[in-house]
Amino acid sequence: SGSKIGNGCFGLPLDRISNTSGMGCRNPIQNRPKSTPGGS
């Protein structure tokens, strides 16, 4: 549930935050598994 929201990041228009802050898609859990493969 939240496949579309999680895809972005926190469920907000990360289109700008992701580019401006860069922390929008870097803190979400979706990016976590990518950073540490085999963590799950």
UniProtKB/Swiss-Prot annotation:
One of its GO terms (biological process) is vasodilation. Keywords: Disulfide bond, Hypotensive agent, Metalloenzyme inhibitor, Metalloprotease inhibitor, Protease inhibitor, Secreted, Toxin, Vasoactive, Vasodilator. Expressed by the venom gland. InterPro entries: Natr_peptide, Natr_peptide_CS. It comes from the Eukaryota. Transmembrane segments: none annotated. Residues 17-40 are annotated as: Disordered. It is found in: Secreted. Residues 17-34 have a biased composition (Polar residues). GO terms for cellular component: extracellular region. Its main location: secreted. Disulfide bonds join C9-C25. It holds the Pfam family ANP. GO terms for molecular function: hormone activity; peptidase inhibitor activity; toxin activity. Snake venom natriuretic peptide that targets NPR1 and possibly NPR2. Exhibits hypotensive and vasodepressor activities. Recombinant PtNP-a demonstrates a dose-dependent stimulation of cGMP production via the natriuretic peptide receptor 1 (NPR1) (EC(50)=563 nM) in Madine Darby Canine Kidney (MDCK) cells. It also inhibits the angiotensin converting enzyme (ACE). Negative results: recombinant PtNP-a does not inhibit platelet aggregation. Belongs to the natriuretic peptide family. This is Natriuretic peptide PtNP-a.
